């Protein structure tokens, strides 16, 4: 029986440990709730090879979600050879955190995707950027960006009933990404928003869980953001390796490396405990490598590594799940002008600010115009409901696996 004639018996693999990345759950829910997929779920955390092999024998398709290769490759490295030895079933692998990092190897991830014999690599980036990163393994690279979960992110109260004008909860972007656009933009709006009579609640020391994040957005008339990702993506680790070596040279005191057993053990802790641990190591005598390196001033890395380094031709920025979350709660977005995977259009679906911030005052005036804010919010909501929910993405993946 052809796959398209019935529900696909799908093996859905993810790496599950306490995390506040709500989009992990959104993608999982997209497939488990979609009528075209008959899903069996497995957590690759400690998954025995023989157990995986047994399930592979019964699957028509295999999907590895972003979590399998986003923060660590420790567990994906164990399952990749077993996936590569399968005798049946097409494999579609999503890719998480598509930027070069001192703590994570992009070419090693690509190599493991090749070992797993991925038939389709689903990138969050534009297709040409994904091909630039993963094209060497011969798999089909397809752009499958994030989307809206309308069950989790529903329209909030009417704008007049919301208590915050502009709100953001998240983390500062690290200096090793090579641009400070988001951090500077949030700082700019934090300063100028009150000057325009706006109540601003912007913090960069905490990421909320899905329900808390949806509730917070529902309290905000607007939020501020930029595209996710980095201008300096590369299929190899040569450039980021030099940055990593420099950061290690700057270490002082007791620093727990990102690949130590202590760091790996911390991933298993409940989110509140992890948050407390991060706070303690950020200011105490013992530090995690990541928190230690995040204290390095952006200008220091920029002048040493990025100022004279040309950007690659591949566009390494992308729309993120948080953009769709805001659209779902009908929270107006003020954002630096960008492509957003060619989905969102400036001043039609978000209020656009120029890269030099020269029109911030004008953007805030437009935001304060109730009719303009409502128009942009409704335009974005209608666009996303018409073709950019996770149900739409799951249907697209179904076509990829059955064509």
Task: Name each model feature, range by range.
Residues 55, 112-114, 209, 216, ...:
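Structural alpha-helical scaffold elements that stabilize or flank donor/cofactor-binding regions
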Residues 200-206, 292-294:
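Active-site donor-binding acidic/aromatic loop of nucleotide-activated sugar
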Residues 186-202, 250:
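A conserved nucleotide-sugar
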Residues 3-18, 22-44, 212-403:
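Catalytic binding pocket for nucleotide-activated donors in carbohydrate/polymer assembly enzymes
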Residues 148-162, 178, 211-212:
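Acidic anion/phosphate-binding donor-loop and adjacent secondary structure
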Residues 2-138, 147-155, 361:
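Extended catalytic core of nucleotide-activated donor transferases of GT-like folds
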Residues 22, 176-188:
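A conserved mid-protein helix/loop that constitutes part of the nucleotide-sugar donor-binding site
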Residues 160-177, 219:
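Conserved donor-binding/catalytic core segment of Leloir-type glycosyltransferases
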């Amino acid at each position: 029986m052809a796959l398209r004639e019935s529900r696909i018996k799908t093996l859905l693999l993810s790496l599950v440990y306490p995390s506040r990345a709500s989009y992990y759950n959104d993608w999982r829910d997209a497939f488990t709730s979609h009528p075209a997929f008959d899903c069996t779920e497995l957590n690759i955390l400690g998954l025995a090879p023989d157990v995986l092999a047994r399930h592979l024998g019964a699957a028509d398709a295999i999907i590895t979600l972003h979590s399998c290769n986003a923060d660590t490759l420790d567990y994906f490295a164990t399952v990749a050879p077993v996936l590569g030895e399968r005798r049946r079933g097409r494999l579609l692998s999503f890719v998480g955190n598509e930027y070069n990092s001192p703590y994570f190897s992009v070419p090693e991830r690509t190599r493991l995707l090749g070992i797993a014999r991925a038939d389709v690599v689903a990138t969050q980036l534009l297709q040409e950027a994904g091909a630039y990163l993963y094209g060497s393994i011969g798999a089909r690279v397809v752009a499958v960006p994030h989307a809206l979960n309308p069950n989790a992110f529903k329209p909030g109260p009417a704008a007049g009933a919301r208590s915050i004008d502009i709100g953001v909860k998240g983390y500062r972007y690290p200096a090793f990404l090579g641009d400070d656009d988001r951090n500077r933009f949030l700082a700019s709006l934090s300063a100028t928003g009150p000057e325009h009579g706006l109540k601003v609640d912007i913090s960069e020391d905490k990421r909320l869980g899905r329900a808390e994040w949806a509730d917070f957005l529902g309290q905000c008339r607007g939020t501020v953001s930029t595209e996710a990702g980095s201008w300096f993506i590369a299929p190899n680790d040569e450039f980021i390796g030099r940055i990593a070596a420099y950061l290690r040279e700057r270490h002082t005191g007791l620093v727990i490396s990102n690949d130590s057993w202590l760091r790996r053990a911390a991933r298993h802790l409940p989110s509140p405990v992890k948050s407390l641990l991060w706070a303690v190591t950020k200011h105490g005598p013992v530090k995690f490598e990541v928190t230690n390196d995040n204290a390095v001033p952006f200008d220091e890395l920029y002048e040493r590594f990025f100022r004279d380094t040309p950007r690659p031709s591949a566009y390494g920025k992308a729309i993120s799940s948080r953009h769709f979350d805001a659209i779902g709660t009908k929270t107006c977005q003020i954002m630096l002008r960008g492509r957003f995977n060619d989905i969102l259009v400036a001043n039609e679906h978000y209020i656009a600010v120029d890269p030099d911030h020269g029109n911030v005052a004008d953007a805030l005036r437009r935001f304060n115009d109730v009719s303009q804010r409502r128009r942009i919010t409704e335009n974005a909501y209608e666009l996303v409901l018409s073709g950019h929910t996770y149900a739409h993405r799951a249907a697209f993946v179904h076509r990829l696996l059955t064509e």
